[in-house]
Amino acid sequence: MNGNDLIRVISFNLKRDFGLPLNRSHKWSERRALAAQYIRESGATIIGVQELLPNMREDVSRLLDVDYSVLGFGRYSGIRPQSDEHSDIIIKNDSAKVNLIKTFWLSKEPEHLSRAYYAIFPRICTVAEIYLKDLGRSIRVFNTHLDHICGIARTLGIRVILGYMERFNEERALPTVLMGDFNAKPGSRPVRMLHSQLEEFPGIHLTDVYSRVEPSEVHNTLHNFSG
């Protein structure tokens, strides 16, 4: 894609309640309208969200209405309806349409409900092939939420994602976006892997968007409900 083929994408951890005592303003019921407002006002064509529980998904779909589509599948494949956390991809319908949507697991059996050996929960990645109406072309978007405890599980997750990127590109090469909540610091091994040219994935070349923006525009993605 060249400089004229610009689109806006954002990654947004919506923060589930977890049943812990929270300040009232931190509860999802108090934040949902603001979250939907932020998505609308961002002007983003594609939004990757994390920690999206089924009740939150219903709220987001209702508040964004027909202007957006919320796409993806839960990490428990619907087996646990109340806690089936999603890492969905949201698209703005007047600017994009989805030709393919798929969710896979970040484990050694990524096509089946499973988890990495050291991971507390199953972790997933949602991938979508999205046609951009204004540009007349398609891109592929991966959205994920890596394990919050175990570095080994995060590293495995990145390897699984890169493997899927390579296989998808062998079938049909497309410009690709990877976004999500990596639960990792900039110098950590999972992030370094994404910066490196890995011998086992010779066809994958990723650019860190933080390297393309002014330092004043770089912010920590851990927002702590502060904006």
Which sequence ranges carry the predicted segments?
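Active site of divalent-metal-dependent phosphoester/diester hydrolases
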Residues: 69-92, 107-111, 118-122, 171-173, ...
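N-terminal, active-site-proximal structural segment of metallo-dependent hydrolase catalytic domains
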Residues: 1-64, 75-85, 159
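His/acidic metal-ligating clusters that form di-metal
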Residues: 124-142, 151-194, 207
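Sec-exported extracytoplasmic/periplasmic mature domains
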Residues: 40-44, 61-65, 166-170, 195-199
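Structured beta-strand-rich core segments of catalytic domains in phosphoester-bond hydrolases
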Residues: 46-142, 146
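Active-site metal-binding loops of divalent metal-dependent hydrolases
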Residues: 12-14, 144-146, 180-182
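Active-site environment of divalent metal-dependent phosphoester hydrolases
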Residues: 17-19, 52-58, 148-152, 183-191, ...
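A short acidic, helix-capping loop that chelates divalent metal ions and anchors anionic groups
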Residues: 17-22, 110-113, 217
